[in-house]
């Protein structure tokens, strides 16, 4: 290489050193000073990994004094380049020797890096292009936000999330029956709102006991890192901000915290975008005296644009309580309780018409008359004739029914603010079978009970009942060895025998107390060596994850998982179908919660519920009340808490006493009341609401598309290559999973979201659903999103040189492949990406400037290319510069034309969609007051803003690949 003092070079291996200056040339060595860092490097003149930096006419360069020069001409003297051109500040003709160039110059533009010899590996160019394509595909998906969460693809859940999550500031009531996944629906909506930019700040208000469960659910299922706020956290946060709620974007807190005026005032002032309230049916309200808790939520709902209320079903709440929730969502719409009752009565005709349309028989005259009146502004006669006709294609008739149903849904009822699914309307639940196993009461327990009664002492009726239901706890009060009870308790003997006879089955065991769960694990381990693990509230999240993973493991995993009451909250184990209730809770809702650990949508087997109980004790009497009175073991009992509230005192007396007649009377009265409530609920079912809530065929279509995306092997390959390029260690763990760890040779110093000790991931949804410790990787996962951002936000893969070995083309033939990005700067909340997302535009030019991209696709072209080393690549670029410069200008012409066309298409799509939606909502507002004026105003403003952003769309060169034909 010809070196001269003062020449400017850059290091091919350490480009971060900036622009270097040759300071010594002696013998076979050259010394280069890098002023930006003050470091010297000595190289062999023959093999120095250096690239000479020279600029061309038209380029703008900066002097070390800070002024710029637009180059018009280059001359050379004594081996140094002198640049002639116009001074940026004075406009005068000036010269600038290369020695005086600014040493902090970095080559960020792809063409600058190419001409400076900063040429990247061929595979990195490919990964960069794939990353841009993945980002574009994700941004254009109408299912954005639904693919990534680690949840089962349940139609009604995906439907609700799809419908609600796309709205601006949604205000809805989620009132599904227990076990249908209200928390998942809320999480999906939150995830979608955050991912699409419709929301940035979210406040979740939950009961104290559910804060931890929500924290875990949001992290494990939705990769959302919420922070739990209590009084201590608020005090700590004062160091960072006067308002502690401003220190985090995603916050979970309890109602108790917000009962304090100071904290409520701070929450009201914290600019939330979305408010989520769990267990909202506990907010007590009457027109005369709303509770403090209700007032807290009401105050927040008045200042937060989006509100999600998770609540029990309206059937369970009663009309007044249900009205109180709707009033929080839209006080202008639901302003008077009597008016609400009158409106509900008018829904009966709508429900009758909907039920007729949902069936397959011809419509009765009453239904036709109702439809004609309800849809008076439309001509529905052709649809009615089609439905009533004989010998017509059934698909056409079904389409006509669906169209009329949709018209009803749009115009009537509370379908836009209320979603309620019931097990009666949602398929996919297993059957439940109850298996009672009576055991003889041990003498030790009888003795403990007698001693306790002799000692006397005042206890409440509920405390006495709890004591009678857990004789092992009473026994431990009189024994030094607290674990000795399991040595003689016949329930433990039965449990051991049961597990031994069902060795191939996974068994979930639930007990009330953590101490009981720990004792049972010890009993199984020491007496028979049965593999079991425990799960209780004293364990950390990581410990619980490990226990759950050990239980889920098919080979070498635990046969049994023993949970405490609180420890099992929020965890589901659908892969098991045997449930052992070691004792019974004194609350029907807790019993349903226990069974709900297995009885979820997605459970593939019927559930066998086993109850080993002690005969002639409170355990047997409570079992009879649950089974004979409520049928709570084999069916869900939505009225369970109502019945418990009505019969609690009688039940407690029966449990504490031993009166057979009292028990018989209690069972008879409970059965009668149970049937009355069940009948009332059946009569009150709103068919139209159910149809709207579960989504029908439209929901199934969404799930089918999501399932197809899950099977996309091309995505898996792209993500694996992405991690390979970045340098993430990947270890195959088996069972469809791999372990990702940071490596010492990673391209970037940190990989946000990748823990130092690694993380186990899978691309298989079923595997992720069965293992809490394995993350589900989709293109929405933060590890993928971060990887895409690391590559596309850096210079990785922006330049490349390759050889095409093709004897059909003359040797030396040049092709220039240019990847441009069409983009428009806009806030995420504007939703511009729906119409003009960051879009890669590929241009493939031959030496004459013809664009061959339409004839030669990327994949087939890429397969034919071979890499060249950086040094040779730099020489090829230098030799080709006279050809390349005009090709860049030609490529930009083609790309700009493509961008102009994209903007036209985006504007047409935006105008068509938003104008259509606006017209639809404006016409519906005349007949359905649930259409909010805020939604209409948002659409009008959005159209104006989007047109402004589209006018400012930009074109940017993202990556370059120069290709030369070789016959060697």
UniProtKB/Swiss-Prot annotation:
Record keyword Nucleotide-binding present: yes
GO biological processes: regulation of DNA-templated transcription
Motif DEAH box in this chain: 278-281
Residues given in the record as ATP binding sites: 176-183
Key words of the record: Activator, ATP-binding, DNA-binding, Helicase, Hydrolase, Nucleotide-binding, Transcription, Transcription regulation
Top-level enzyme category: hydrolase
SMART domains tied to this protein: DEXDc, HELICc
Molecular function in Gene Ontology: ATP binding; DNA binding; helicase activity; hydrolase activity, acting on acid anhydrides
Domain Helicase ATP-binding: start-end pairs: 163-332
Domain of life from the UniProt record: Bacteria
Name of a matching Pfam family: Helicase_C
Domain Helicase C-terminal residue range list: 491-643
InterPro entries named among the record's database cross-references: Helicase_ATP-bd, Helicase_C-like, Helicase_RapA, P-loop_NTPase, RapA_C, SNF2-like_sf, SNF2/RAD54-like_C, SNF2_N
Enzyme nomenclature, EC number: 3.6.4.-
Family the UniProt entry places it in: Belongs to the SNF2/RAD54 helicase family. RapA subfamily.
Subunit structure and binding partners: Interacts with the RNAP. Has a higher affinity for the core RNAP than for the holoenzyme. Its ATPase activity is stimulated by binding to RNAP.
Function: Transcription regulator that activates transcription by stimulating RNA polymerase (RNAP) recycling in case of stress conditions such as supercoiled DNA or high salt concentrations. Probably acts by releasing the RNAP, when it is trapped or immobilized on tightly supercoiled DNA. Does not activate transcription on linear DNA. Probably not involved in DNA repair.
Protein name: RNA polymerase-associated protein RapA
Species of origin: Shewanella putrefaciens (strain CN-32 / ATCC BAA-453)
Source species taxonomy: Bacteria, Pseudomonadati, Pseudomonadota, Gammaproteobacteria, Alteromonadales
């Amino acid at each position: 290489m010809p070196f001269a003092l003062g020449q400017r070079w850059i290091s091919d291996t350490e480009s971060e050193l900036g622009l270097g200056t040759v300071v010594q040339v002696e013998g076979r060595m050259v010394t280069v000073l890098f002023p930006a860092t003050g470091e010297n490097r000595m190289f062999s003149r023959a093999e120095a990994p250096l690239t000479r930096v020279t600029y061309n006419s038209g380029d703008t360069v900066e002097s070390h004094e800070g002024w710029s020069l637009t180059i018009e001409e280059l001359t050379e003297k004594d081996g140094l380049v002198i640049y002639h051109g116009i001074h940026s500040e004075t406009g005068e003709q000036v010269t600038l020797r290369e020695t005086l160039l600014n040493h902090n110059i970095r080559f960020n533009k792809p063409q600058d890096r190419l001409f400076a010899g900063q040429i990247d590996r061929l595979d990195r160019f490919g990964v960069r292009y794939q990353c841009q394509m993945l980002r574009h595909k994700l941004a254009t998906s109408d299912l954005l936000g639904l693919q990534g969460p680690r949840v089962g693809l349940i139609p009604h859940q995906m439907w609700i999330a799809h419908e609600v999550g796309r709205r601006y500031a949604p205000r809805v009531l989620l009132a599904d029956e227990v076990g249908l996944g209200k928390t998942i629906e809320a999480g999906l909506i939150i995830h979608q709102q955050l991912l699409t930019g419709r929301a940035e700040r979210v406040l979740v208000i939950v009961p104290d006991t559910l804060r931890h469960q929500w924290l875990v659910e949001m992290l494990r299922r939705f990769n959302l890192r919420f922070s739990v706020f209590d009084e201590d956290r608020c005090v700590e946060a004062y160091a960072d901000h006067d308002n502690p709620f401003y220190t985090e974007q995603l916050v979970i807190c309890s109602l108790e915290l917000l009962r304090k005026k100071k904290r409520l005032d701070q929450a009201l002032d914290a600019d939330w975008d979305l408010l989520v309230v769990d267990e909202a049916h506990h907010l007590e309200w009457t027109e005369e005296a709303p509770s403090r808790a209700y007032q807290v939520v009401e105050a927040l709902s008045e200042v937060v644009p989006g509100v999600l209320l998770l609540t029990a079903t309206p059937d369970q709440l009663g009309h007044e309580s249900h009205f109180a929730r709707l009033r929080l969502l839209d006080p202008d719409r639901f302003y008077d309780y009597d008016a609400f009752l009158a409106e509900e009565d008018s829904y009966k005709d709508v429900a009758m018409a909907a039920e007729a349309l949902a069936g397959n028989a011809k419509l009765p005259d009453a239904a036709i008359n109702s439809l004609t009146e309800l849809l008076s502004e439309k001509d529905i006669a052709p649809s009615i004739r089609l439905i009533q006709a004989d010998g017509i294609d059934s698909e056409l008739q079904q389409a006509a029914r669906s169209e009329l149903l949709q018209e009803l849904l749009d115009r009537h009822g509370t379908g836009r603010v209320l979603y309620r699914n019931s097990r009666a309307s949602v398929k996919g639940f297993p059957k439940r079978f109850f298996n009672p196993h009576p055991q003889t009461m041990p003498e030790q327990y009888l003795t403990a009970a007698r001693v306790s009664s002799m000692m006397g002492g005042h206890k409440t009726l509920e405390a006495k009942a709890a004591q009678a239901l857990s004789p092992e706890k009473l026994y431990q009060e009189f024994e030094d060895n607290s674990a000795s009870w399991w040595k003689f308790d016949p329930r433990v003997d039965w449990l051991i025998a049961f597990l031994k006879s069902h060795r191939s089955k996974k068994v979930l065991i639930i007990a009330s107390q953590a101490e009981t769960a720990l004792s049972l694990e010890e009993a199984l381990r020491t007496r028979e060596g049965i593999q079991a693990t425990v799960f209780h509230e004293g364990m950390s999240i990581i410990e619980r994850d490990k226990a759950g993973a050990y239980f889920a493991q098919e080979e070498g995993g635990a046969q049994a998982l023993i949970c405490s009451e609180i420890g099992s909250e929020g965890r589901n184990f659908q892969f098991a179908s045997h449930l052992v209730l070691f004792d019974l809770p004194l609350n029907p809702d807790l019993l349903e919660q226990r069974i709900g650990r297995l009885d979820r949508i997605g459970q593939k087997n019927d559930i066998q519920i086993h109850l080993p109980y002690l005969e002639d004790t409170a355990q047997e009497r409570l079992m009879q009340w649950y089974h004979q009175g409520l049928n709570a073991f084999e069916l869900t009992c939505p009225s369970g808490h109502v019945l418990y509230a009505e019969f609690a005192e009688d039940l407690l007396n029966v449990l504490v006493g031993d009166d057979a007649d009292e028990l018989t009377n209690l069972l008879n009265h409970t059965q009668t009341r149970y049937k009355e409530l069940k009948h009332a609920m059946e009569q009150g079912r709103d068919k139209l609401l159910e149809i709207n809530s579960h989504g029908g065929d439209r929901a199934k279509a969404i799930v089918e598309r999501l399932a197809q995306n899950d099977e996309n092997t091309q995505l898996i390959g792209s993500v694996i290559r992405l991690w390979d390029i970045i340098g993430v260690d990947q270890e195959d763990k088996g069972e469809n999973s791999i372990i990702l760890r940071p490596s010492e040779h990673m391209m970037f110093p940190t990989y946000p979201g990748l823990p130092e000790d690694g993380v186990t991931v899978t691309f298989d949804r079923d595997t992720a659903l069965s293992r809490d410790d394995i993350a589900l990787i989709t293109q929405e996962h933060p590890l993928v999103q971060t990887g895409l951002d690391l590559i596309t936000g850096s210079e990785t893969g922006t330049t490349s040189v390759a050889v095409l070995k093709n004897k059909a083309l003359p040797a030396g033939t040049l092709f220039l492949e240019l990847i441009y990005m069409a983009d428009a700067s806009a806030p995420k909340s504007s939703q511009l990406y729906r119409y003009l997302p960051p879009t890669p535009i590929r241009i493939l030019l031959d030496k004459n400037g013809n664009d061959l991209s339409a004839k030669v696709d990327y994949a087939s072209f890429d397969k034919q290319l071979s890499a060249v080393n950086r040094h040779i690549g730099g020489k090829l670029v230098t030799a080709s510069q006279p050809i390349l410069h005009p090709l860049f200008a030609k490529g930009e012409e083609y790309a700009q034309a493509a961008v102009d066309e994209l903007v036209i298409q985006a504007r047409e799509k935006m105008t068509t969609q938003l104008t259509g939606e606006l017209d639809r909502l404006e016409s519906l507002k005349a007949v359905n007051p649930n259409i909010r004026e805020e939604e209409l105003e948002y659409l009008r403003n959005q159209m104006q803003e989007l047109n402004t952003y589209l006018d400012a769309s930009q074109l940017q060169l993202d990556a370059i690949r120069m290709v030369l034909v070789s016959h060697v």
